UniProtKB/Swiss-Prot annotation:
The keyword Protease applies. It holds the Pfam family Proteasome. A double ring-shaped homohexamer of HslV is capped on each side by a ring-shaped HslU homohexamer. The assembly of the HslU/HslV complex is dependent on binding of ATP. This is ATP-dependent protease subunit HslV. GO terms for molecular function: metal ion binding; threonine-type endopeptidase activity.
């Protein structure tokens, strides 16, 4: 799936998880529509962080579905993600949604792909969106070769992604657990 207009990054280090997202919304390939969109939010009484990349309406549909699954499984993020992706794969309308979610709680970081996969990274760093590869590379390097904390790694990695990706800006929303 091709995603534009965003970078979402999660970093866990020393027991802290940070989830960051830029604020740019791009219409097509030629126009920036918004600079300060909120693509990162807290779910389940603030215990889970979530960010999205892709079509906004589709992402909100996925947020709603995920939140309903969270309630069903009493806040267990991994189980809710797996249950949601089962529905995602089975439902012919959900399969057409063009969005991805990046989820984090104190123990796990998960990517829910546009094809209904649940992926947990090996190295406590994950990113989605058009600037995701740049933010991911920066975050991995900073995690491995610096004494920076999760929040600083996330902010600096997002700054680097914004310098490279034309669909990402430096208006960053960052949440931590």
């Amino acid at each position: 799936m091709e995603t534009h207009a965003t970078t979402i990054l999660a970093v866990r280090k020393d027991g802290i998880v940070a989830l960051a997202g830029d604020g740019q919304v791009t219409m097509g390939q030629t126009m920036i529509m918004k600079h300060a969109a909120q693509k990162v939010r807290r779910l389940h009484d603030g215990k889970i962080l979530a960010g999205f990349a892709g079509a906004t309406a589709d992402a909100f549909t996925l947020f709603e579905l995920f939140e309903s699954k969270l309630k069903e499984v009493r806040g267990h993020m991994v189980r809710a993600a797996v249950e949601m992706t089962k529905d995602w794969r089975k439902d012919k309308y959900l399969r057409k949604l063009e969005a991805m979610l990046l989820l984090a709680d104190r123990e796990h970081i998960l990517v829910l792909s546009g094809t209904g996969d649940v992926i947990e990274p090996d190295d406590n760093v994950a990113a989605i969106g058009s600037g995701g590869p740049y933010a991911l590379a920066a975050a991995r390097a900073l995690s491995r070769h610096s004494g920076l904390d999760a929040e600083t790694i996330a902010r600096e990695s997002m700054r680097i992604a914004a310098e490279i990706c034309v669909y990402t800006n430096d208006h960053v929303t960052l949440e931590t657990l």
